[in-house]
């Protein structure tokens, strides 16, 4: 059985490490996880010790993916856990009783930045890896099916860590992949993709008393927003994933209330 107490302790350790994105990013937490796993691997006897692979992949300066692989005795597809190490920014709303990096436990609930997304899931995946390594050490042989843990960077931004892992051949379509993102305990078999885009409108400035002499870039953007919302509403829904959605997360424009924005 996986050691639940170990998973709890590890989750608290991970929450206490700032890996906000943007912010501290993943350098410290990646080194912490790597050191923990290296100490576990060091306790294996040969030939298992020689078989286990620990690999790093620098995706961005100072931001490394980490993969640990326990090879299997058969050629069956590996089981691959993939988890991201970064969190969103620490943000506001915390206090002295529950600080963002406090890892406070109350009523069997862990509080802190990233406790849910996804250091709790990351700790569970590492605990599964450690359990596998302990089984290998106790039984003196590798498992029938290979096992890999991938800890990725940049999930909260452009997911360049996951893309780099795929491009490097760390994971492919043949493997069985489990992502321990929070889903309220519901097993999900797919999720929506995403596309980020920027739109820039160019207008012609004029005084607000004579707007017909200019071209209002903000008004043009409003038309574009409404048009895109109507277009998305008309798209067919997916049987598993539901309808496509669009969100306009940020709009900037204008100079002063008395000037037609360009």
Predicted segments, located by residue:
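Midchain, well-structured core segments that form catalytic/ion-binding scaffolds
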Residues: 163, 167-262
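Acidic/histidine-rich catalytic neighborhood of metal-dependent amide-processing enzymes
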Residues: 118-192, 196
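Structural motif
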Residues: 77-80, 108-109, 148, 175-178, ...
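Generic secondary-structure signature for well-ordered alpha-helical cores
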Residues: 16, 38, 42, 134-137, ...
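Active-site metal-binding loops of divalent metal-dependent hydrolases
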Residues: 19, 85, 155, 182, ...
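Short, conserved micro-motifs enriched in small and acidic residues
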Residues: 108-123, 134, 215-218
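Acidic/His- and Gly-rich active-site-bordering loop/insert found
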Residues: 1-113, 137-143
């Amino acid at each position: 059985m996986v050691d639940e107490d170990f998973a709890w302790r590890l989750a608290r350790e991970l929450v206490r490490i700032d890996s906000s994105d943007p912010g501290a990013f993943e350098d410290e937490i990646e080194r912490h996880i790597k050191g923990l796993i290296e100490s576990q691997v060091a306790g294996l006897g040969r030939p298992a010790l020689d078989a286990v692979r620990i690999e790093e992949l620098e995706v961005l300066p100072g931001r490394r993916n980490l993969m640990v692989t326990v090879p299997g005795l058969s050629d069956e597809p590996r089981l691959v856990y993939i988890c991201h190490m970064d969190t969103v920014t620490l943000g506001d709303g915390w206090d002295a009783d529950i600080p963002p990096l406090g890892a406070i436990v109350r009523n069997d609930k862990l509080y802190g930045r990233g406790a849910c997304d996804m250091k709790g899931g990351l700790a569970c995946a590492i605990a599964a890896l450690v359990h596998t390594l302990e089984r290998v050490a106790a039984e003196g042989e590798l498992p029938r099916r290979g096992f890999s843990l991938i800890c990725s960077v940049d999930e909260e931004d452009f997911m360049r860590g996951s893309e780099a892992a795929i491009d490097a051949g760390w994971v492919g379509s043949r493997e069985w992949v489990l992502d321990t993102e929070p889903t309220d305990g519901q097993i999900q078999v797919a999720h929506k993709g995403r596309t980020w885009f920027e739109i820039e409108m160019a207008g012609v400035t004029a005084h607000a008393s004579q707007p017909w002499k200019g071209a209002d870039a903000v008004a043009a953007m409003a038309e574009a927003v409404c048009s895109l919302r109507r277009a998305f509403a008309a798209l067919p829904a997916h049987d598993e994933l539901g309808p496509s959605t669009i969100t306009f997360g940020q709009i900037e424009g204008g100079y002063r209330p008395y000037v037609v924005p360009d």
